């Protein structure tokens, strides 16, 4: 069997790498993606919002019956389509992320193959796919993977415009603008800023920037961008007027970048350094080696190494300078980091499996265990279990003195749960009067000072977990 595999590799290394990459993509990006509940907060509320699109106008997002105008719609459209095709299940909600991630993996392979060889393309695609960031965020249905995929395709296509024949350049540039346009519908202005900065700097350095502004490419691109983006933005403006301009563009585009205090997401300048180090495991040590080699060996003289260095620095640098920071923001920096790391490993080739790799693999397992622990001890699993328990009983569900949790809506489907958002004993008494047989979910930390403590003393404690408790009325 081993001899046949070796012979197949010898006869057709390209096919061997593609088949192996397909198998690894299936294992890393698809297997088990529906085996665990949705993670609060974004994944669960985005899933509910996507499901609700199936019942009203697809232009207008709603969250708990309130207009949600801070995000563009593409992620929600894709997820809603998957839910319509496959039902409202965890795997259906996450499937689009896995598909987009897999396309990005194979696109990365072909770019790497074009630059050096099929082996280099495989190394790069494997590094990009098999790290904590990419695996974890492919398996969580949030906007970042959609944006990362479209941004990566846009930048790759910008690179391909240098390789294709003149007769095919118009198609390549058109594809570039189409991906950028849909990226704008996924994340907004960053889908324009990043490709223009990266491709623009690269073209300036290589003295070929004039091609970008040729009318047959640039004007066609502008028309494509407007055709794709005007309908939704116009519909939103007609529906919500100046409020849409303020919330969508000013507050969540510009304010988020320069004044994140208003959104509670401000972080220090170097915030992403440890975040990316952990997220890029098990390749982080090799990436550091690649950075050292970049300066020590003056690798910036290589056209493509310089391109991916610019690619990484622009994304990592701009996100670091922004006032608002979340760990997932820096996911788009993984593809260029994979290329730079692949260069480093490709040059070492058979010598690369040494101490740093073993240390990195160990660190990755530790990181994954920690991340899994954070997710499953953060309360989401408790809400899922409590909601399912109430769903399978004859009891009505009430949540008390806690924010709206989409995980409850996803798993309690008999009717609408009563949501009491603050510590209001009168509202609790009224809910218990209306529903004689009820179960109540409450945060443990809120119980000691609750004004409804006497009411809870007359209820039965069904389950007490790390973050939440479940009570029920006594017959």
Describe these PLM feature segments:
Residues 345-370:
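Signature aromatic-anchored transmembrane alpha helix within multi-pass, membrane-resident enzymes
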Residues 2-351, 376, 407-414, 449-450, ...:
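Membrane-integral, polyisoprenol-dependent glycosyltransferases
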Residues 26, 367-474:
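Short periplasmic/luminal acceptor-recognition loop of GT-C membrane glycosyltransferases, typified by
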């Amino acid at each position: 069997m081993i001899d046949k595999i070796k012979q197949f590799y010898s006869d057709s290394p390209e096919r061997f790498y593609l088949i192996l990459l397909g198998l690894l993509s299936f294992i890393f990006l698809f297997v088990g993606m529906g085996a665990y509940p949705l993670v609060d907060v974004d994944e669960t509320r985005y899933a509910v919002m996507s499901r609700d699109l199936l019942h009203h106008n697809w232009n207008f997002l709603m969250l708990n019956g309130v207009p949600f105008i801070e995000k563009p719609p593409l992620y929600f459209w894709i997820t809603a389509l998957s839910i319509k095709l496959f039902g409202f299940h965890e795997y259906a909600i996450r499937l689009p992320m896995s598909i987009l991630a897999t396309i990005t993996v194979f696109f990365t392979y072909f770019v790497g193959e074009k630059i050096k060889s099929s082996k280099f393309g495989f190394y790069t695609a494997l590094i990009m796919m098999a790290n904590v960031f990419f695996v974890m965020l492919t398996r969580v249905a949030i906007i970042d993977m959609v944006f990362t995929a479209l941004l990566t395709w846009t930048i790759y296509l910008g690179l391909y415009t240098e390789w294709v024949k003149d007769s095919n350049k118009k198609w390549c540039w058109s594809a570039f603008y189409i991906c950028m346009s849909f990226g704008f519908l996924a994340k907004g202005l960053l889908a324009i800023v990043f490709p223009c900065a990266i491709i623009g700097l690269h073209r300036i350095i290589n003295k070929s920037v004039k091609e970008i502004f040729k009318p047959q490419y640039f004007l066609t691109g502008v028309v494509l961008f407007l055709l794709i983006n005007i309908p939704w933005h116009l519909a939103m403006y007609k529906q919500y007027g100046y409020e849409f301009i303020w919330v969508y563009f000013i507050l969540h585009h510009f304010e988020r970048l320069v004044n994140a205090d208003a959104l509670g997401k401000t972080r220090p300048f170097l915030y992403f350094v440890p975040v990316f180090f952990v997220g890029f495991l098990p390749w982080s040590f090799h990436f550091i080696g690649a950075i050292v080699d970049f300066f020590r060996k003056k690798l910036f003289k290589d056209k493509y190494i310089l391109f991916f260095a610019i690619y990484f620095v622009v994304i990592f640098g701009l996100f670091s300078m922004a006032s608002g920071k979340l760990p997932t923001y820096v996911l788009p920096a993984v593809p260029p980091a994979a290329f730079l790391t692949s260069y480093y490993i490709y040059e070492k080739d058979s010598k690369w499996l040494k101490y740093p790799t073993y240390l990195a693999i160990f660190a990755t397992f530790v990181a994954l265990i920690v991340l899994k622990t954070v997710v499953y001890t953060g309360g989401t699993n408790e809400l899922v279990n409590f909601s399912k328990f109430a769903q399978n009983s004859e009891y009505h569900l009430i949540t008390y003195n806690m924010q709206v949790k989409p995980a409850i809506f996803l798993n309690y489907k008999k009717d609408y749960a009563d949501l009491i958002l603050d510590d209001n004993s009168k509202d609790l008494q009224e809910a218990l009067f209306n529903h004689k047989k009820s179960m109540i979910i409450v945060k443990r930390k809120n119980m000691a000072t609750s004004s409804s403590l006497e009411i809870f003393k007359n209820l039965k404690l069904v389950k007490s977990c790390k973050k939440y408790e479940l009570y029920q009325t006594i017959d």
